[in-house]
């Protein structure tokens, strides 16, 4: 019997998969517990429509990420952060990704999750630093962060 999986079932299939399984297993376990439904013409066309909508949504998200990348990598987009520093231009403390995200939100009204900012080590010196930001699994931008002394 052909079924469409509604959830991931370990060892059998993932959500959205169409597979042939034994009739008894399908009727007595998969369909009964809501893990799958029978694959007929109506359910197959509904699945195709859902996949098409999912692809369209993913394309929109990718387009938004590329638009955000263009804005963040613009020459004029420089995130300025003030911090206390010593005479040798080393900071007292450091600037973590959370502070960069807050400054980006204040200065450019861009809400960005601090976990998307891929800062290997917190910034500990004055000057310009290029910081990578993962906007999408295919799109990564670099923002300029300028640390100035208070």
From Swiss-Prot:
SUPFAM superfamilies: L9 N-domain-like (SSF55658), Ribosomal protein L9 C-domain (SSF55653). InterPro entries: Ribosomal_bL9, Ribosomal_bL9/RNase_H1_N, Ribosomal_bL9_bac/chp, Ribosomal_bL9_C, Ribosomal_bL9_C_sf, Ribosomal_bL9_N, Ribosomal_bL9_N_sf. Keywords: Ribonucleoprotein, Ribosomal protein, RNA-binding, rRNA-binding. One of its GO terms (biological process) is translation. GO terms for molecular function: rRNA binding; structural constituent of ribosome. The keyword Secreted does not apply. GO terms for cellular component: ribonucleoprotein complex; ribosome. It comes from the Bacteria. Belongs to the bacterial ribosomal protein bL9 family. Binds to the 23S rRNA. This is Large ribosomal subunit protein bL9. The lineage of its organism: Bacteria, Bacillati, Bacillota, Bacilli, Lactobacillales.
